[in-house]
Every structure is written in structure tokens, then in C-alpha cells.
Amino acid sequence: MKRTYQPSKLVRKRRHGFRARLATAGGRKVLAARRARGRKRLSA
């Protein structure tokens, strides 16, 4: 059985990147929550 995590910089950015977060209402809520917590990094 292969491992489930097969790293890819492109897929990481597309799925979890800043622009991907801004694209949906839920993603914007995620960013707002992370800003409220004072996260240094908001997204991948």
C-alpha cells in the first residue's frame, strides 16, 4: 500500500494556498479566523 501523502508544491498551493482560500466564502472565514488568532502564516 502506498503512503497517502505524495508531496507536490503545485497541488499544495492550488488546494490550500492564499488565493484558493479567498475564492470561497468558507475559505475567507478560515483566513479571518487565522488572522484573529494571530497566526504568522495564514495559508500554504
UniProtKB/Swiss-Prot annotation:
Single Gene Ontology MF annotation: structural constituent of ribosome
Superkingdom: Bacteria
Keyword line: Ribonucleoprotein, Ribosomal protein
Any one annotated GO CC term: ribonucleoprotein complex
One GO process term, biological-process aspect: translation
Pfam families: Ribosomal_L34
Protein family according to the UniProt entry: Belongs to the bacterial ribosomal protein bL34 family.
PANTHER family: LARGE RIBOSOMAL SUBUNIT PROTEIN BL34M, MITOCHONDRIAL RIBOSOMAL PROTEIN 34 FAMILY MEMBER
NCBIfam families attached to this UniProt entry: rpmH_bact
Protein name per UniProt: Large ribosomal subunit protein bL34
Origin species: Rhodopseudomonas palustris (strain HaA2)
Name of the coding gene: rpmH
